[in-house]
Amino acid sequence: MARGKFITFEGIDGAGKTTHLQWFCERLQAKLAAGDRQVVVTREPGGTPLGEALREMLLNQPMDLETEALLMFAARREHLARVIEPALARGDWVVSDRFTDATFAYQGGGRGLPRDKLEALERWVQGGFQPDLTVLFDVAPQVASERRGAARAPDKFESETDAFFTRTRDEYLRRAQEAPHRFTIVDATQTIPEIRGRLERVLAAL
């Protein structure tokens, strides 16, 4: 069986990506069913027992910026080794709620960690491995903030300022501009039916 594909969903907190991820995965599974392939749904940070333990620390405990980035990539290495790479080798498809683009956006753009440090970690942990497709849910930080305000108690990232999320969004868009072959940008201010129509077109092209 041919190697599977790796798809990531990205966007600032409040963009709505997680709302659409399960629906997208159900549609993708239906599309792949005839070929006896499975869709593995996962997330970052997380996806493994170690990754989930690190997620709890990363989202809720204050820490040094470089420590934060190192833990993100430690969780990612475990995720790649235990979940993503084995699934792709089996011919399954993997859909992840966030991946490395989020680290560049949040720790790089948002928190200001120099890009060269993140690029060095990326090379060490991933080599040349990148998603086959990244769906970026783009929304203005002010809109995302209003959405987050109606959600559950915020973690330390969700509690950040609009200025932080503006820098984070800008870095996401920079990443998308540098890799247009990999990114599909979704206008996350649209209605749910409009966004799902856009995702249907993404699915049709896979």
UniProtKB/Swiss-Prot annotation:
It comes from the Bacteria. It catalyses: dTMP + ATP = dTDP + ADP. One of its GO terms (molecular function) is ATP binding. GO terms for cellular component: cytosol. InterPro entries: P-loop_NTPase, Thymidylate_kin-like_dom, Thymidylate_kinase. ATP binds at G11, I12, D13, G14, A15, G16, K17, T18. It is an enzyme of class 2 (transferase). Keywords: ATP-binding, Kinase, Nucleotide biosynthesis, Nucleotide-binding, Transferase. It holds the Pfam family Thymidylate_kin. Its EC number is 2.7.4.9. Phosphorylation of dTMP to form dTDP in both de novo and salvage pathways of dTTP synthesis. HAMAP family: Thymidylate_kinase. Belongs to the thymidylate kinase family. NCBIfam families: DTMP_kinase (TIGR00041). This is Thymidylate kinase. It comes from Burkholderia vietnamiensis (strain G4 / LMG 22486) (Burkholderia cepacia (strain R1808)).
